[in-house]
Design a protein with these regions (language model features):
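Conserved phosphate- and dinucleotide-binding cores of soluble alpha/beta proteins
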Residues: 2, 93-208
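N-terminal active-site beta-alpha-beta segment that forms phosphate/nucleotide-binding
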Residues: 2-133
Length: 208
């Protein structure tokens, strides 16, 4: 496919094409352990020095897959600073998830899901969506993003469905490497846009 021809594809086919391309780019990037570790440190430094982090009562993070930026540094710092920390847990046989409070990264996590992602234990307390305070920050993974805040997920809608329930004024931050920031991502009615991007070049407000 010639450069630019993909933009003529119907939205669903374009998303599928972009997912395939982004997965290949991320696989190559994260195969370099030294590079990916440096990226994690750099991204963490940018975020932890931001006012958005300092003002956040709750940090909603994620447990990284092998082709995602590891946010362990951010999560440990949030706990050390006395902030509340939450990570997602998925429901079997559905595309739904909730967030759960965790008190330590040394907790017993489960990987009993189709993505082999670490999830909080059954003893973890679920976040009540209606009680999420303003200025909380959601650090959202994705395969690709654009500068208008569009996010390309893995196609199951976990984050879009959850974030559509959040009514408080929160920060929605897409976390990615700069090589998967693209010009055009089809944005459908149910897609939730990010307010910020975080990558190895900085923490960027998108002023949506």
């Amino acid at each position: 496919m010639a450069c630019g021809d993909e933009l003529r594809l119907p939205p669903k086919e374009l998303k599928d094409f972009q997912r395939k391309r982004a997965k290949a780019e991320l696989k190559a990037y994260f195969s370099d352990r030294e590079l990916s570790s440096q990226c994690s440190r750099t991204v963490s430094d940018y975020f932890l020095s931001s006012d958005e982090y300092k003002n956040a009562p709750v940090i909603f993070s994620y447990m990284a897959m092998k082709d995602e930026i590891d946010l362990s540094i951010i999560m440990k710092k949030a706990l050390d600073d006395g902030k509340k920390l939450c990570v997602p847990g998925m429901y079997p046989d559905s595309n739904d998830m909730d967030f759960y409070y965790i008190d330590s990264l040394d907790e017993s996590f489960s990987c009993d899901n189709k993505y082999n992602i670490k999830e909080p234990s059954e003893k973890s307390r679920k976040v009540e969506v209606a009680s999420i305070p303003g200025n909380s920050v959601f650090l959202c993974p994705g395969l690709a993003f654009n500068l208008e805040g569009a996010r390309l997920g893995r196609g199951k809608g976990y984050y879009d469905k959850y974030l559509s329930r959040v009514k408080s004024n929160v920060i929605l931050c897409g976390v990615c490497t700069v090589n998967v920031i693209t010009k055009a991502i089809p944005c459908e009615e149910n897609d939730i846009r990010m307010t910020h991007l975080l990558n190895e070049y900085g923490f960027i407000s998108l002023h949506r």
